[in-house]
A protein has these predicted regions:
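Segments forming oxygen-rich coordination pockets for charged ligands
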Residues: 115, 119-203, 209
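Hydrophobic, well-ordered beta-alpha structural blocks that scaffold small-molecule cofactor pockets
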Residues: 1-9, 171-178, 183-239, 244-248, ...
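Cytosolic ligand/metal-binding cores
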Residues: 2-123, 233, 237-352
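Conserved small/polar residues in nucleotide/adenosyl-binding loops
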Residues: 395-396
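Long, charged amphipathic helices and adjacent flexible linkers at domain junctions
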Residues: 127-135, 208-223, 228, 349-364
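Short amphipathic
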Residues: 138-147, 356, 365-372
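Short beta-strand/loop turn elements enriched in aromatics
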Residues: 149-167, 372-391
Length: 397
């Protein structure tokens, strides 16, 4: 996914992997060069001409390989190197400094970022996606138009008229697997996923106007003792009653020692009767993070059917995302998109402060600083000649 996105933005990409089939699949989807071999060897890195690269990204599933490859690439001449890690200990300030001294510019832990996204969403249950921009002054919120929504059949401009006092702007609409950059004459339809940027003090009113309101989370069930599940439970177990379910008995015992305020249950989340016996219907939130997309989707569907107010599922197969959204799962977490959002900004100008790849959409939201005397400062925003698929949302000064 990352290679496809970067190549689509005009970058020259070389992909290294020891699996020839994987390389063939990547080459069929994106305009990239491929090099077969072990990325932790000098010979393969030299063959890939890392000495000429502006950015080396090590996102293998093996943490040690990523660290070694990123260090070697930097020593061979790469201008910047990034390594995906699985150990939160590496991110502690003193330890992080060691990796910087070794030549790694940025360490990225996708599970930590994904867990934090879930925690943020549990504080804003009315939205299916929530991201802060401009140091918290602006927020991206996403909501689905349910059959009873008063917005269905109305033009986007009508939404603005009724909520004129709100400081917001609609970014895009995801509909039927397609992304529509919002224009004032666009008509809302049932099932639309609507993406809105709003000022922080207007988020609550925007969501209420759209027919969604926050619910308090007191009881929560997590399916899967994965790194994401553990981090969520660790952060929230002092505030929320949590049940964490995992099918592996040995792991369940380890989790019970680690999470002293979380009720750990050794059970298979695919068994409907077992889930109901554990009180699924009484939960305010259900989070499926087993690491298996199919299991997460089925469990999330059951939770929705039982009336759980907030249902979140980790879905790593990108082909399943639109399906999952169409059947009513509130929020999708995808580590590929989380990784892409965090790494993509390293390919941009230093003036880009943040970037978010939208789940269920092929659009991105960028926050950037306008330089003095740049072309953007010489015209009103309405007179800027932006590409057809680009929209200026809000600005702060």
């Amino acid at each position: 996914h990352l290679a496809k996105m970067l190549s689509g933005n005009g970058h020259d990409i070389t992909v290294i992997d020891s699996d020839p089939k994987l390389l063939a699949d990547v080459a069929s989807l994106a305009d990239v060069l491929t090099v077969e071999g072990d990325s932790t060897t000098f010979a393969v890195l030299r063959k890939a001409s890392v000495r000429k690269c502006d950015l080396f990204i090590a996102v293998n599933h093996v943490e040690n390989d990523n660290v070694v490859a990123a260090v070697l690439a930097k020593q061979l001449g790469a201008k910047k190197s990034i390594a995906r890690i699985d150990n939160n200990e590496y991110l502690e300030p003193n330890n992080k400094e060691i990796f910087i001294n070794m030549g790694i510019d940025y360490l990225f832990y996708p599970e930590k970022v994904a867990a934090q996204e879930v925690i943020n969403l549990l504080g804003h249950t009315s939205t299916t996606e929530y991201v802060d921009f401009s140091s918290g002054r602006l927020s991206l919120v996403v909501f689905r138009l349910d059959p009873t929504s008063s917005l269905i059949g109305r033009e986007l401009s009508g939404f603005k008229d009724d909520a004129a006092q709100l400081s917001y702007r609609t970014v895009a609409i995801a509909r039927g697997g397609q992304t529509i950059i919002a224009r004032q004459d666009e008509i809302f339809m049932e099932g639309d996923m609507v993406y809105v940027i709003a000022r922080q003090d207007a988020v609550k009113e925007v969501m209420e106007f759209s027919g969604h309101s926050n619910v308090e989370i007191n009881n929560m069930m997590i399916l899967g003792g994965s790194r994401i599940g553990i981090r969520i439970a660790t952060e929230l177990q002092d505030e929320v009653n949590i049940k964490l379910i995992d099918y592996n008995a040995e792991k369940a015992y380890r989790l019970a020692e680690l999470l002293d305020k979380t009720l750990i249950i050794n059970e298979d989340g695919r068994h409907i009767e077992a889930m109901l016996e554990e009180g699924l219907a009484n939960m305010d939130a259900f989070i499926a993070v087993t690491g298996r997309s199919e299991t997460n989707i089925l469990a999330a569907m059951l939770a929705k059917r039982m009336g759980v107010k907030k249902v979140i599922a980790e879905i790593e197969n990108l082909d399943y995302i639109n399906l999952a959204e169409s059947i009513g799962i509130d929020t999708i977490i995808n580590k590929k998109l989380v990784t892409a959002s965090n790494i993509f900004r390293f390919t941009m100008s230093t003036d880009v402060q943040a970037i978010k790849c939208l789940t269920g959409s092929d659009a991105e939201v960028l926050e950037f600083i306008v330089k003095p005397n740049s072309p953007a400062t010489k015209h009103p925003i309405k007179d800027m000649r932006l590409p057809q698929d680009v929209i200026c949302l809000l600005y702060t000064s």
